[in-house]
């Protein structure tokens, strides 16, 4: 029985044949389908086709994330996260320096790298540019960032200005300031929900969490970092506005009305029991709020010394001398309030030279009579009824 070749389907008449994939082949038919080189020692197959080692790994092996070409098993590679790179492809995108193992680098777009020196120098340049354009715009995203975020309408800040004013301000900013660099990044609703949930859990996520969010949402790492920065800034502004509103509400709140003093003074629960509650604890005759006594801390002078019974303490009720006779006592009623007090300079003082004791009225009318006429102080600016408690005081001792 004739044996046919699996490659050319012709009968094999050669002395030697090759058995590949459990089928007979001519020696010349066992070759790579890509480069047509003869496979004498080793071959690789996929979908019934034969490949050499180089072409097989080039087409079906791991690809370099930099050049997107296949990586041969004999090639030296470097790994960054889940990506594999050729040594020549693992370079800084700014200075094209080949990055070595253990060197600090910054990943951009998952397959581009920047060495530490170039990143720090670029950050310093960005800070200078930010300071130069800060007078032109105060938007949350700086114009030097490569990607800028446009949140949904639910995430826009509440402001008192209308949409027309906002559009006009944006046009003025674009005309007066430098043009923004890089495209704007639009965050979809599902991506926004994922970022919001992550912000509630950790307002300041670590690099590992940001990497997970980048894999879940498909967004750039830089976009996620800037979104979290803007969200934290927005939370701080909202807290400041709420605190300012609370202070403003407390400041403009209506003032409390002051209650009259007299109503509280006559409350027996506050001032204690007594017929005349304001002076309920004072045991003595009351001569009104305009009394003014001469005070001698070391005793009265020798020429003016008198016994307690002969000390004249009497208020003037008018100009001139007081004639002997009863003087009607005046007691403040419940509706009357003493709101104006006489100053010390306007209060008449008793003359030290007056003599004659005061005697209580035996009829119990609450008045007083003077035995001889009393000279009064030469002060005609004050006149009025003499204030004296009524008979409800129950005590007529002169002091």
Curated annotation (Swiss-Prot):
Q: Which GO terms describe its cellular component?
A: nucleus
Q: Which domain of life is it from?
A: Eukaryota
Q: Keyword Transport on this protein?
A: no
Q: Which GO terms describe its biological process?
A: eye development; forebrain development; neuron differentiation; regulation of transcription by RNA polymerase II
Gene3D superfamilies from the xrefs?
Answer: Cysteine Rich Protein, Homeodomain-like
**Domain LIM zinc-binding positions:** 3-61, 62-125
The UniProt annotation gives the DNA-binding region as: 180-239
Keyword Transcription regulation carried by entry: yes
Q: Name one GO molecular function term.
A: DNA-binding transcription factor activity, RNA polymerase II-specific
List the coiled-coil residues. Answer: none
Q: What is its main location?
A: nucleus
What is the protein name for this chain?
LIM/homeobox protein Lhx5
Q: Kindly list the cysteine pairs connected by disulfide bridges.
A: none
Q: Gene encoding it? A: lhx5
Localization recorded for this chain is: Nucleus
UniProt function note: Probably involved in the patterning of the nervous system, in particular in the early specification of the diencephalon.
- State the InterPro entries in the record: HD, Homeobox_CS, Homeodomain-like_sf, Lhx1/5_LIM1, Lhx1/5_LIM2, LIM_Homeobox_TF, Znf_LIM
Region (Disordered), start-end ranges: 136-185, 301-399
* Keyword terms: Developmental protein, DNA-binding, Homeobox, LIM domain, Metal-binding, Nucleus, Repeat, Transcription, Transcription regulation, Zinc
């Amino acid at each position: 029985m004739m044996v046919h070749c699996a490659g050319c389907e012709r009968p094999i008449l050669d002395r030697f044949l090759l058995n590949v994939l459990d089928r007979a082949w001519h020696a010349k038919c066992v070759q790579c389908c890509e480069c047509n080189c003869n496979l004498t020692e080793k071959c690789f197959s996929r979908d019934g086709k034969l490949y050499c080692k180089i072409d097989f790994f080039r087409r079906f092996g791991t690809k370099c994330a930099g050049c997107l070409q296949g990586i041969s098993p004999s090639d030296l590679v470097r790994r960054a996260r889940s990506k594999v790179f050729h040594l020549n492809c693992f370079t800084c995108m700014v200075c094209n320096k080949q990055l070595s193992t253990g060197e600090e680098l910054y990943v951009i777009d998952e397959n581009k790298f920047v060495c530490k020196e170039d990143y720090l120098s670029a950050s310093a340049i960005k800070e200078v540019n930010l300071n130069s354009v800060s007078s032109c715009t105060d938007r949350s995203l700086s114009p030097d960032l490569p990607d800028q975020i446009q949140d949904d309408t639910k995430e826009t800040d509440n402001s008192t200005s209308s949409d027309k004013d906002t559009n006009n301000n944006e046009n003025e900013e674009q005309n007066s300031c430098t043009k923004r660099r890089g495209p704007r990044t639009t965050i979809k609703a599902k991506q926004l929900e994922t970022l919001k949930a992550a912000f509630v859990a950790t307002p300041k996520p670590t690099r590992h969490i940001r990497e997970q969010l980048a894999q879940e949402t498909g967004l750039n790492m830089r976009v996620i970092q800037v979104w979290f920065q803007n969200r934290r800034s927005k939370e701080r502004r909202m807290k400041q506005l709420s605190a300012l509103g609370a202070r403003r509400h407390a400041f403009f709140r209506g003032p409390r009305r002051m209650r009259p003093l007299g109503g509280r003074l006559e409350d027996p629960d506050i001032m204690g029991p007594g017929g005349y509650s304001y002076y309920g604890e004072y045991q003595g005759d009351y001569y009104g709020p305009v009394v003014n006594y001469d005070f001698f801390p070391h005793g009265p002078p020798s020429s003016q010394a008198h016994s307690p019974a002969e000390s004249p303490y009497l208020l003037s009720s008018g100009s001139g001398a007081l004639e002997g006779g009863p003087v009607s006592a005046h007691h403040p009623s419940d509706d009357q309030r003493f709101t104006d007090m006489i100053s010390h300079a306007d209060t008449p003082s008793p003359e030290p030279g007056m003599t004659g004791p005061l005697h209580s009225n035996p009829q119990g009318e609450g008045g007083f009579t003077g035995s001889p006429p009393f000279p009064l102080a030469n002060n005609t600016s004050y006149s009025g009824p003499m204030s004296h408690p009524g008979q409800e005081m129950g005590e007529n001792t002169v002091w």
